[in-house]
């Protein structure tokens, strides 16, 4: 089975956003705006936490997949590329977690 990466998912979201069409859930989410996409992401985050607290491995994996999808849709809605998030993560790897947290603007 070929490996499906988060970059593959981002490319799929980009393609569906560009193609549009009534059958595209991605397009429907984006058409409702970034605020709606943020709400959906929040709902999925809560469902992911619940699955983790319940210690339900299969449910956590499924909700984690939903969470990643909705995060990427939210990024798309706000015009942010996955590579920008990766760059932010990359900057953090050069310092400890405590140093990174202290460097953030409140």
From Swiss-Prot:
Gene Ontology process terms (BP): L-histidine biosynthetic process
Key words, A-Z: Amino-acid biosynthesis, ATP-binding, Cytoplasm, Histidine biosynthesis, Hydrolase, Nucleotide-binding
Catalytic activity annotation: 1-(5-phospho-beta-D-ribosyl)-ATP + H2O = 1-(5-phospho-beta-D-ribosyl)-5'-AMP + diphosphate + H(+)
Main location: cytoplasm
Compartments it resides in: Cytoplasm
Gene3D superfamilies: MazG-like
Pathway: Amino-acid biosynthesis; L-histidine biosynthesis; L-histidine from 5-phospho-alpha-D-ribose 1-diphosphate: step 2/9
GO cellular component term, pick one: cytoplasm
Keyword Transmembrane: no
Family membership: Belongs to the PRA-PH family.
Stored HAMAP family: HisE
Protein's UniProt name: Phosphoribosyl-ATP pyrophosphatase 1
Lineage, highest ranks first: Bacteria, Pseudomonadati, Pseudomonadota, Alphaproteobacteria, Hyphomicrobiales
């Amino acid at each position: 089975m070929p490996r499906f990466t988060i970059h593959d998912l981002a490319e799929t979201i980009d393609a569906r956003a560009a193609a549009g069409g009534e059958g595209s859930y991605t397009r429907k989410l984006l058409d409702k705006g970034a605020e709606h996409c943020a709400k959906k992401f929040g709902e999925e985050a809560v469902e992911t936490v619940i699955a983790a607290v319940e210690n339900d491995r299969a449910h956590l994996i499924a909700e984690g997949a939903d969470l990643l999808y909705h995060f990427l849709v939210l990024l798309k809605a706000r015009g942010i590329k996955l590579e920008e998030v990766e760059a932010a993560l990359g900057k953090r790897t050069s310092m400890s977690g405590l140093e990174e947290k202290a460097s953030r603007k409140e």
